[in-house]
């Protein structure tokens, strides 16, 4: 009998207490996580490097630390804007992705993950992200990165989100059809596609995303949210006067993540599932929430 859980829980390294990358990897393992998400900017800050420091020696060092902690990298994050209209900026961003794709292979072949950009050089959250032209720009930039991923045998995973260019399940499907690369996959964060006007339709949006894009989902993000009555900060707003504030999975009870775990049990058991927006005081509870969901959904699926 296959006893793989429905999901394999992980944590974002920068949601753990302050420390070096090595210290945070050990923290993740001590908490019971077996997967981490490692943003390149966190690695750069800890090591005092830029992309030129992504060497075989560093990869060997990190692999030793990861192995000792019983942890592996689910996603190496690279969040440079692929929809920028600034050509010089775009070329530099391409170089960043190439460096991260190469380093991911040195680490053992983990995917490189990214968000879906905005069509302005400031990467500002604005209505221009909703246009067809924005989607064109992102798809063009993504196609270039996918070519590089294919060349090195790597993977690039995009994470759709309301604050970015790929902000609905249908726009995600369109990108997947236009950039038909075997190296392209999706990180699915259900809460990232929500905003105040649609929170009551959250499960319907989730079902549509799984239907349209489920075959390309390679990793999950797990978080919860609350709605607050102001739009004082950019992001998670939609002109209603409210915005979403994100928390770790299970912290507020506003988003029911269990249907996603049930989908995973049937479609891709053991898929990495990274907790987002936890804080040091809540990380252990978020892990317990995911473990309980994974056990319930995995057992239910095995009984079918």
Where are these regions (language model features)?
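C-terminal helical cap(s) of enzyme catalytic domains, especially alpha/beta-barrels
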Residues: 283-303
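Acidic/histidine-rich catalytic cores of soluble enzymes
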Residues: 3-11, 35, 139-251, 296-304
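Short acidic/polar active-site loop segments enriched in Thr and Asp
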Residues: 34, 72, 110, 218, ...
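Active-site acidic/histidine proton-transfer and metal-coordination neighborhood
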Residues: 23-26, 60-61, 65-69, 83-188
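Glycine-rich, proline-tolerant flexible connector loops at the mouths of alpha/beta enzymes
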Residues: 37-63, 116-122
